[in-house]
UniProtKB/Swiss-Prot annotation:
Organism from which the protein derives: Sus scrofa
Molecular-function annotations in GO: actin filament binding
Protein name: Scinderin
Gene name of the encoded protein: SCIN
Location of the protein in the cell: Cytoplasm, Cytoskeleton; Cell projection, Podosome
Ranges: Gelsolin-like repeats: 59-99
Stored Pfam families: Gelsolin
Keywords: Actin capping, Actin-binding, Calcium, Cell junction, Cell projection, Cytoplasm, Cytoskeleton, Phosphoprotein, Repeat
Length: 125
């Protein structure tokens, strides 16, 4: 008889095997214990969140505070305002991260907004 196997993964340091289960990349949402596990409505067209997109092999979209202090010129960000989804590309971000950020933004539009959001590209500088 075989027994179940339990593995531990640390956020931001996930194993290749674990990350392989998420073909579209990983999304880290704000909340958890600190928020009291409050329900977040992702399908509402009134959503307001900022996602920091990083990674080459495994794309990680991490929810960060919606503030100019969160931005930097070396990375890509997605500003999700519900009916509009802005793809913000820093002046020093690489082509691969731009492509991945576009894929994440398209996924949000198609899967979380049922195609009802407008995608808008913004270049820094």
């Amino acid at each position: 008889t075989s027994k179940p196997v339990q593995n531990r993964e640390l956020q931001g340091y996930e194993s290749t095997d674990f990350x392989g289960y998420f073909k579209g990349g990983l999304k880290y949402k704000a909340g958890g214990v600190a928020s009291g596990f409050n329900h977040v409505l992702t399908n509402x067209l009134s959503a307001q969140r900022l996602l920091h997109v990083k990674g080459r092999r495994v794309v990680r979209a991490t929810e960060v505070p919606l503030s100019w202090d969160s931005f930097n010129k070396g990375d890509c960000f997605i500003i999700d305002l519900g009916s509009e989804i802005y793809q913000w590309f820093g002046s020093s971000c690489n082509k691969y991260e731009r492509l991945k950020a576009s894929q994440v933004a398209t996924g949000i539009r198609d899967n979380e907004r049922n195609g009802r959001s407008q995608l808008i590209v913004v270049e820094e500088g």
